[in-house]
Amino acid sequence: MNYIVRIFAWALIWSLISVSPGFGQNAIIKIDTDRTLGEIDRNIYGNFVEHLGRCVYGGIYDPGNPLSDEDGFRKDVMEAAKGLNIALIRYPGGNFVSNYHWLDGVGPERTTRMELAWSRIETNFFGTNEFMKFVRKVGTEPYFSVNMGTGTIEEAQRWVEYCNVKDGPYYAELRKKHGYPEPWGIKYWSLGNEMDGFWQMGHLNAEDYCKKAREAAKLMRLTDPNIKLIAAGSSNYRPNADPDEWNETVIRELRDVVDYIALHIYVGNPDNNYYNFLATPLVLEQRTKVTKGIIDKHMQKAHRGNRPPIYIAWDEYNVWYRARTDESMQGTRALEEHYNLEDALVIAEFLNAFVRNADVVKMANMAQLVNVIAPIFTNEKGMFRQTIYFPLALFANHVAGTSLDVFVKCDTYDTDEFFIGLGESKTVQKNVPYLDVSAAIKNNEIVICVVNRHKDKPITTEILCQKGLFSGPFKIYEVNGPDIKAMNDFGQENIKTQTKPELKVKGSSFTYIFPAHSFTLLKGKIE
């Protein structure tokens, strides 16, 4: 009898081992450099600055603070921003832009206004030229949004003239009078923000938005033919909305006019369900594929000359749910979200998704840069890097070149039915892989990015090279911590990038154990 019991006990243990991702019996990643997805655009490593809370005032701009330079910019913030290797920064909004009039924020006399999007007073001490000084100091590029809400198409045209025309017309000369003899040469301009949202000042239906956007685009391009234009795609995924219909209309009507369509997503974990939360980036990827299908359909009849097809710009994305009450969305300290490890893993998955969809996702902007749902957090005496800073920095500094179509075999799980965020529809995700993977190659240098979604188990994985051989040491960077709820704070960097010992690799395969609840970046060569 005891013998039989022991037999059954060992059989049970073996069955658990055989299916457990912690022991990784079937975890495989295959890298084939012939299976390419598209060129990775550096603009997926963008960010966003809006006049909201302490993002601008008390964030990037803090005149009189001992930590600020002669122009009022926080030196510690600029150094942290440089570490993110930001490709471009979107400005000035966001909801803010739909009641923003750029002339209020240039020249020696600034106009103080009621700021209606986020319920505060806007002094306009910081405007176009201050922002351009900031991006030049940080070493990045600007991306401006024009006011398609309360603004006019003429106002949009005049802003392009002010920024991009060297001399001659009134607004170019006005810029010179303001002390800036050379044009700023701003390449990227979006035609409004979230215009399908009922919360947007000057909200329009799709047909009326397209009429206004088309005429604004006409005037803006006549002023500077070299600019790139981004249309406002849907941001309204509430149960009674039809975001795909909005996107279909915008792409159909503006298919000959714009270069990108902008999409937004914010996710959260209000129900404290780790596995549901870690599946939310799959929704972004599914929406990407639906929108790509709409683009492909309408590009068949487009007249674009030698311009490429419309691309997707995820120009707002982040985790945002704690600071989303009416009280926490208004005033000086609005949207001050404090992030933990599980949030950082979701950000890494978003970035994996952008890389996997490199053929169509050519821009992405984390919202926002400082204090407001941001990777950088300040007070008057210092700053710290939030958990979400580290995966973004790793991707921006290491992942470039050509995206590869990676084969992944590992255990999976199913989610419950859940809301991915406030104002979102419900989803159920099936067969969610515990390993979320992307890979890129540039000049024979391979980068493999892996999130282990498993909360408790490390996953032992065989990594195979289908063409060529892995060669030389692999550098390994890991973002992890003692607990999925671990956070950073002033003087407490509990979650950060850890450089692990190099892995000596030679041949067609190697094995790596991905720790539980971790993001790992491996970087080596293929010969």
Give the location of each predicted region.
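Positively charged n-region of N-terminal signal peptides that target proteins for export
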Residues: M1-R6
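Non-catalytic accessory regions flanking glycosidase/transglycosidase catalytic cores in CAZymes
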Residues: F23-W246, R252-Y260, L284-A323, M329-E527
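Bacterial N-terminal signal peptides
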Residues: F8-V19
